[in-house]
Design a protein with these regions (language model features):
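Glycine-rich phosphate/pyrophosphate-binding beta-alpha loops
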Residues: 188, 267-276
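Predominantly a Rossmann-like dinucleotide-binding segment in NAD(P)-dependent oxidoreductases
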Residues: 121, 129-239, 300, 385
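N-terminal Rossmann-like dinucleotide-binding module
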Residues: 1-50
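C-terminal helix-rich "cap/oligomerization" subdomain common to oxidoreductases
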Residues: 1-6, 71-73, 116, 296, ...
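Beta-loop-alpha module in the N-terminal Rossmann-like domain of NAD(P)-dependent dehydrogenases
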Residues: 51-114
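Glycine-centered short loops/turns at secondary-structure junctions
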Residues: 29, 92, 119-120, 145, ...
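C-terminal glycine/acidic-rich active-site capping loop/insertion
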Residues: 214-240, 246-258, 281-282, 286-362, ...
Length: 390
């Protein structure tokens, strides 16, 4: 296998998530050789992280033409993901694209077609929740049949960073982030994690969406995600994306015999006061259940009807041996959000370095395309008040 430190990455985007990718790559020893964004932000990011090549004025095509970049990380706003993904594939670069893959299924289908061409580079979509050891453990338990036949799944993804009408981010605008904001932005992480655990995709949905702040306020200029702004300097605008979503899902046939035809329900909110980033899910089967919450990332609760419930911790004998390869620290040393990104990047880069011989546990272009199709079905269902096939 080619050593990971010989691979070179270029990152497009300098907002909140771009530096998360850079940090993950640095921890793996991957060379980050190029950064692309606005000239000011790209230079500042390069100086902070010691990145040698800077491509300002959002000139991503120049970065993709660089012989010093093997893998392109696309961490730019949603509306340009498809354009940049297609350009990266055409330039012969492997791609790690932030979710969502694109704004519409019609355009993401083009990425799938390009990524599936013979000899095309590796393409991954960053649904990194797959790489929490707890999620991998839940997947192993389901696939072994430890929980029996899976009956249903329930859970939520709650945040509060857009609780106030004066909270602002470009994702609030359908023209920038897409028509489905809460479900599309964070809910798809929940849905992808469940799909990964079950080994099955959602085939139909019934959804209710609600926008509580019909009028919001935005700053006069640009600002970074989570940055604070004086409300007195803000301007009102009509918000056209949802704050909350409740989604019922029916999953199709699983890759194994324990999780076909599963029903699920999820509540998604970005206005849940007090919850900063709570992704919780429970898998319920005929023999037992297992529950997990991102805010306690190293623990899962196993439930039985006729036996005592158990709390299993990462780094102990309760977790499967094959999960150990996705953890770097001993039990009692929590691994969280940054570590899931690191493990996702490790899986992608090992797949590249091995000539595609290592397992591709990461989400592919096809997976990203399916999530965009699902988001379109959620929108259609909420408007029609009926079940819609994905």
């Amino acid at each position: 296998m080619q050593p990971l430190h010989t691979l070179r990455a270029g990152v497009i985007g300098t907002g909140f998530i771009g530096p998360v990718h850079i940090e993950a790559l640095k921890r793996l020893g991957v060379q980050v050789t190029a950064i692309c964004g606005s000239t000011k932000n790209a230079r500042a990011t390069a100086e902070r992280w010691g990145i040698p090549e800077v491509f300002g004025d959002y000139d991503y095509r120049a970065m993709l033409a660089s012989p010093n970049v093997d893998v392109a990380h696309i961490t730019s706003p949603n509306k340009v993901h498809v354009e940049q993904s297609l350009a990266a594939l055409a330039a012969g670069k492997h791609v790690v694209c932030e979710k969502p893959l694109g704004m519409t299924a019609k355009e993401t289908a083009k990425v799938v077609a390009a990524a599936r061409k013979k000899g095309s580079p590796v393409f991954a979509v960053n649904y990194m929740c797959r790489f929490f050891p707890a999620v991998l453990q839940m997947r192993a338990m389901v696939q072994r049949g430890d929980l029996g036949r899976i009956i249903h799944v329930q859970g939520h993804f709650f945040q509060d960073w857009l609780l106030h009408a004066t909270d602002y981010n470009w994702r609030l605008l359908a023209s920038e982030g897409g028509k489905l904001r809460a479900v599309g932005g964070i809910g798809t992480h929940w849905i992808d994690a469940v799909s990964f655990i079950l080994g099955a995709r959602a085939e139909s949905v019934f959804a209710h969406l609600e926008t509580f702040h019909k009028t919001r306020h935005r700053p006069r200029g640009e600002r970074q995600t989570f940055a604070k702004v004086d409300p007195r300097t803000m301007l009102p605008y009509k918000c056209d994306t949802e704050d909350f979503g409740s989604v019922l899902l029916r999953f199709g046939k699983a890759q194994h015999g324990f999780a076909s035809g599963v029903h699920a329900n999820a509540s998604i909110s970005q206005v849940a006061a007090g919850w900063k980033c709570s992704l919780a899910l429970g898998i319920y089967g005929t023999k037992g259940s297992v529950r997990w919450d991102l805010q306690q990332p190293d623990e899962i609760l196993v439930g039985r009807r006729d036996e005592p419930n158990q709390t299993l911790q990462r780094g102990t004998a309760g977790f499967s041996e094959d999960v150990a390869g996705f953890t770097d620290y001993p039990g009692g040393h929590p691994e969280g959000f940054p570590d899931s990104h690191k493990m996702h990047c490790r899986a992608v880069y090992q797949h590249i370095a091995s000539g595609r011989k290592s397992p591709a546990l990461f989400a592919t272009a096809g997976d990203g395309h399916h999530e965009v199709k699902l988001c379109e079905a959620v929108l259609k269902s909420s408007r029609a008040r009926q079940w819609v096939n994905v």
